[in-house]
Amino acid sequence: GLQMAHADEEVTLIDTVSYSNVPAGEELTLQGILMDKETGEALEIDGETVTSELTFTPESTEGTVDVEFTFNATEAAGKTLVVFESLYYGEEEIASHQDLSSPEQTLVLPSVSTTAANPELGNQTGLAKAEASITDVAEYTNLIAGETFTIRGTLMDQETGEELLIDEKPVTAEAEFTPEETSGTTELTFAFNAEALAGKTLVVFEEILYKDQVVASHRDISSDPQSIYFPQIGTSATDGEDGDQEILADSEVTIKDTVSYENLVPGASYLLKGVLMDQETGEELLLDGNPVTAETAFTPEERNGSVEVVFTLDGSSLAGKSLVVFETLYYVDADGTQREICSHKDIDDAGQTVHLSENPPEVPEEPTETPSVSNPVKTGDDAPILLYLGIGAGALVLAGALTVLYLRRRKQKENK
């Protein structure tokens, strides 16, 4: 009957050839080639046909001999191969078996491809919560209708390339199915605790088994359709005026929160909702009895990026307080339904925190400097008066000395 094999990088096919009415004791040659049943042409791998040749000397006119083919079958996944054999005696072909419809000469290489999704959202966005689930739809080809198969899946951590471990155990799922046709689909559901998976990308690896033998698998750590993306956000709050984290407690305060995101679905609709928290109390900041909130709707073009949420408030009564921004990211369905997918709420996170301080007291402006001019002497200004009196006394002494000298000289002249 039909034989199945896994399309591995190295597949060995053994074709057992029965012969009769051949010359015993003579050297014979068997030449085999693999054919693509769908096209009716020789199978080509990397541009080359897959062939095998065996020379043997039969001891009797009838018997069996094995012809072995070894090849890379990864490119042939999903194909049905048929072995054609020709028997030569010298240069003469004396027998052949070339029947594309012969089940005994046929090797089936099944294939499977998978598409993973979050059943709650209907897309590839994972929810980091205690009871999470992933549904993987496996599309298979070249199975045997009516036979029982097992599909087995494992969740992989794309970053490490290793199995995802939750509580030190891999996350797996398994189910049996019986295809009605050689090609079709089947589903496998994974249920697990995803609370610690924010920011991670998981990849579903699948394999199909027939009688405990793997006959098809899909194990591509970089495959987007097999991946589930768990979003993550981080925030950085600053003064909307100068970009630092110190804000004057004015009547008009602007806080700008830059939210970086990872693992979103490009083209999908999202909504960020933020609220200001009083770090001292750990509760929402209330102004006039109402929380201070802000929100931003956006559609990412890439899986990773950033967006801003801006808060405006009267901060005149908040001097000395430290405010922390809490952000929650929602996925918005086509009907407008908002579904929370992740958040960033850490009351001790310095990056999410701004500090409000009192306005400094007004400092009077210093007078403009002008060239100094001597002021007139004023009553009560002792230093200038003493200075002038000293100068005056010196002048009087000098005048007196000159007068005495003048009088003395005059008298001397008169006596002469």
PLM regions with names:
Residues H355-A383:
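C-terminal low-complexity, Ser/Thr- and acidic/Pro-rich disordered "stalk" regions positioned immediately N-terminal
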Residues E93-P110, V214-P231, D335-P361:
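Short beta-strand elements
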Residues G380-G394:
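Juxtamembrane/start-of-transmembrane alpha-helix segments at the extracytoplasmic/lumenal side
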Residues G1-Q3, S113-Q124, G234-Q245, N375-K378:
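Short, solvent-exposed loop/edge segments of extracellular or virion-exposed proteins
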Residues A73-V83, A194-V204, G315-V325:
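Short glycine/proline/serine/threonine-rich loop/turn segments at secondary-structure transition edges
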Residues V397-K416:
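C-terminal membrane-anchoring or membrane-association module
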Residues E59-T70, E180-A191, E301-T312:
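Aromatic sugar-binding surface patches on proteins
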Residues Q3-V11, N123-A132, Q245-V253:
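Short, solvent-exposed loop/linker segments at the N-terminal edge
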